[in-house]
Amino acid sequence: MPTTQPRLNLESLYRPLWLTYGLVPLLAGLDKFFNLLTDWPKYLSPWMANLLPMSPQTFLYLVGIIEIAVGLMVLTRWPRLGAWIAAAWLVLIALNLATLGLFDIAVRDLAMAVGAYTLARLAEARQEAPAAAPASALRESRV
């Protein structure tokens, strides 16, 4: 007797990740200019700060611009590319945090990198969907 399995709607997985990895980098990037959420420079390891040709706060302004760009990429025409950048970026942030001994936050950022990777793969699956079918019609995952 054949078993029937419910079909997985990839769009239901894609949308929350798309929103998360669009808005979180955008808001975190904006906050690099205001330091409302936290004092961002304290998360920059001293050895890295010593390598910078600028002040840590100026460096974080550049980081903020990159994060804003990544968030906008995810939310607009380039979600796949933005998600890949976010995944790599989060791994680098986790490495920096680990050098500060902030392992709990580093592990969180590594988990977020896995989510960004998942978003990138889902975005690829959406791009591969037949042109005749709307993205919401994509129901099966490719492994």
Which residues does each predicted region cover?
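Short Gly/aromatic-enriched secondary-structure transition segments
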Residues: D39-W47
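Extended, low-polarity transmembrane helix blocks
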Residues: M1-T38, N50-A69, L75-V143
